[in-house]
Amino acid sequence: EENFNNLYAYPNPVHPTYRGHITIKGLMVDTQVRILDAAGNLVKILEGQGGAAVWDGNNERGQRVASGVYTAVCNTKSGESHNSVKILIMN
Protein backbone atom coordinates (compact mmCIF):
# COMPACT_ATOMS: atom_id res chain seq x y z
CA GLU A 1 0.00 0.00 0.00
CA GLU A 2 1.13 3.56 -0.68
CA ASN A 3 -1.12 4.98 2.02
CA PHE A 4 -3.52 3.82 4.72
CA ASN A 5 -6.72 4.58 2.77
CA ASN A 6 -7.81 0.92 2.71
CA LEU A 7 -7.17 0.27 6.41
CA TYR A 8 -9.60 -2.11 8.13
CA ALA A 9 -9.75 -4.81 10.80
CA TYR A 10 -11.61 -8.12 10.80
CA PRO A 11 -13.46 -9.68 12.38
CA ASN A 12 -14.97 -6.49 13.70
CA PRO A 13 -16.82 -6.59 16.02
CA VAL A 14 -15.07 -9.48 17.76
CA HIS A 15 -17.81 -11.66 19.29
CA PRO A 16 -17.46 -13.40 22.70
CA THR A 17 -17.10 -16.88 21.22
CA TYR A 18 -14.29 -15.84 18.83
CA ARG A 19 -10.76 -16.63 20.01
CA GLY A 20 -8.91 -16.46 16.69
CA HIS A 21 -6.66 -13.71 15.40
CA ILE A 22 -7.80 -10.20 14.58
CA THR A 23 -6.23 -9.03 11.32
CA ILE A 24 -5.50 -5.38 10.54
CA LYS A 25 -5.16 -5.00 6.75
CA GLY A 26 -4.20 -2.20 4.39
CA LEU A 27 -0.87 -1.40 6.05
CA MET A 28 2.05 0.27 4.34
CA VAL A 29 5.58 -1.17 4.30
CA ASP A 30 7.42 -0.92 7.65
CA THR A 31 4.36 -0.14 9.74
CA GLN A 32 4.12 -0.41 13.50
CA VAL A 33 0.65 -0.91 14.99
CA ARG A 34 -0.08 0.18 18.55
CA ILE A 35 -3.27 -1.16 20.11
CA LEU A 36 -4.71 1.35 22.61
CA ASP A 37 -7.65 0.98 24.99
CA ALA A 38 -10.41 3.59 25.30
CA ALA A 39 -8.35 5.52 27.87
CA GLY A 40 -5.39 5.67 25.50
CA ASN A 41 -3.28 3.13 27.39
CA LEU A 42 -0.94 0.98 25.32
CA VAL A 43 -2.20 -2.61 25.20
CA LYS A 44 0.02 -4.23 22.55
CA ILE A 45 2.59 -3.36 19.88
CA LEU A 46 2.51 -5.22 16.56
CA GLU A 47 4.76 -5.15 13.50
CA GLY A 48 3.07 -5.12 10.11
CA GLN A 49 4.16 -7.77 7.62
CA GLY A 50 2.97 -8.11 4.05
CA GLY A 51 0.41 -5.32 4.40
CA ALA A 52 -1.18 -6.79 7.54
CA ALA A 53 -0.69 -7.17 11.29
CA VAL A 54 -2.23 -9.90 13.42
CA TRP A 55 -3.43 -9.41 17.01
CA ASP A 56 -4.40 -12.31 19.24
CA GLY A 57 -6.73 -10.14 21.37
CA ASN A 58 -4.33 -10.29 24.32
CA ASN A 59 -2.32 -7.60 26.07
CA GLU A 60 1.48 -7.61 26.44
CA ARG A 61 1.14 -9.93 29.48
CA GLY A 62 -0.76 -12.51 27.42
CA GLN A 63 -4.11 -11.81 29.09
CA ARG A 64 -7.32 -11.47 27.05
CA VAL A 65 -8.35 -7.81 26.91
CA ALA A 66 -11.61 -6.65 28.46
CA SER A 67 -14.69 -5.82 26.40
CA GLY A 68 -14.51 -2.40 24.84
CA VAL A 69 -13.40 -0.31 21.89
CA TYR A 70 -9.72 -0.49 21.02
CA THR A 71 -7.87 1.69 18.54
CA ALA A 72 -5.18 0.28 16.26
CA VAL A 73 -2.88 3.25 15.57
CA CYS A 74 -0.77 2.54 12.50
CA ASN A 75 2.42 4.50 11.82
CA THR A 76 5.10 4.03 9.22
CA LYS A 77 8.51 3.75 10.88
CA SER A 78 9.62 6.83 8.94
CA GLY A 79 6.79 8.76 10.61
CA GLU A 80 5.53 10.05 7.27
CA SER A 81 2.13 8.36 7.33
CA HIS A 82 -0.39 7.28 9.95
CA ASN A 83 -4.01 6.27 10.39
CA SER A 84 -6.13 4.31 12.83
CA VAL A 85 -9.00 1.86 12.94
CA LYS A 86 -11.31 1.05 15.85
CA ILE A 87 -11.95 -2.55 16.93
CA LEU A 88 -14.88 -3.57 19.15
CA ILE A 89 -14.12 -6.50 21.47
CA MET A 90 -17.10 -8.20 23.14
CA ASN A 91 -16.23 -10.81 25.77
Range-by-range predicted roles:
Residues 1-34, 52, 80:
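Glycine-centered coil/turn sites that cap beta-strands in beta-rich domains
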